[in-house]
């Protein structure tokens, strides 16, 4: 999820309110701050990518996979190494069903808070657990923020850094209707949708997913996994 940038208790409350009310505003601000990452798909085709962070989760990941099967679409799952070690069968199921996997850290410490050595060790530990991936190798920072030095380390290890362009901030567990509204408002050619399948109660995300998919189809958009849309570094 995108981290809340605040230094005081009052600032945290204000920032959370901003996330809930104006998701696209926050996204635009972060795009200015982080130019060396992938925010959307550069394509002339009417494609979008749907991604899920923080999993796998034994309750919500299977429900999401069932919905994806029902609509015959492929997604990208940014996995946490520690959770892959706990639920290896879910990682295998994600791969077996043809989805793309990416690295979302090993233990979900906020990426921006790690020093370079800690970050590199965490990255490689997660990579070992998640397993080798065909290029491109994809990384999404835990907490949604990352330092320039960390981006350089990712490039050293042949990773592309991916954030996204359509957020619902579902870690805060907004209502299902809000998730549908926030994501559908960002549905356009090249959008990268960011949702979460772990880290808390994700039932509203699961329930919103069919409407999001159907709204994308009504807009003439088709879903692709990121491995088919992003070139390897």
Explain the meaning of each model-derived region.
Residues 23-112, 118, 125, 129, ...:
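Active-site beta->alpha N-cap acidic-glycine motif
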Residues 65-74, 78, 99-100, 106, ...:
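CE4/NodB-like, metal-dependent polysaccharide N-deacetylase domain
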Residues 92, 116-123, 175-181, 206-210:
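Charged helix-capping and loop-helix junction motifs
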């Amino acid at each position: 999820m995108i981290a809340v940038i605040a230094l005081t208790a009052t600032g945290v409350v204000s920032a959370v309110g901003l996330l809930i009310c104006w998701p696209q505003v926050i996204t635009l601000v972060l795009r200015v701050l982080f130019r060396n990452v992938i925010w959307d798909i550069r394509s002339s085709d009417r494609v979008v990518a749907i991604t899920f962070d923080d999993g796998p989760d034994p309750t919500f990941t299977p429900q999401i996979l069932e919905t994806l099967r029902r609509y015959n679409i492929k997604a990208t799952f940014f996995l946490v190494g520690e959770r892959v070690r706990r639920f290896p069968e879910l990682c295998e199921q994600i791969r077996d069903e043809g989805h793309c996997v990416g690295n979302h850290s090993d233990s979900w410490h906020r990426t921006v808070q790690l020093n370079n050595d800690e970050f590199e060790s965490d990255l490689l530990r997660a990579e070992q657990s998640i397993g080798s991936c065909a290029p491109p190798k994809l990384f999404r920072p835990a907490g949604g923020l990352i330092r320039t030095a960390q981006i350089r380390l990712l490039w050293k290890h042949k990773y592309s850094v991916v954030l996204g362009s359509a957020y619902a901030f579902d870690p805060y567990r907004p209502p299902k209707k809000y998730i549908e509204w926030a994501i559908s408002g960002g549905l356009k050619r090249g959008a990268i949708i960011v949702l979460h399948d772990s880290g808390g109660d994700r039932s509203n995300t699961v329930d919103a997913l069919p409407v999001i998919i159907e709204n994308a189809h009504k807009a003439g958009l088709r879903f692709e996994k990121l491995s088919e849309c992003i070139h390897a570094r």
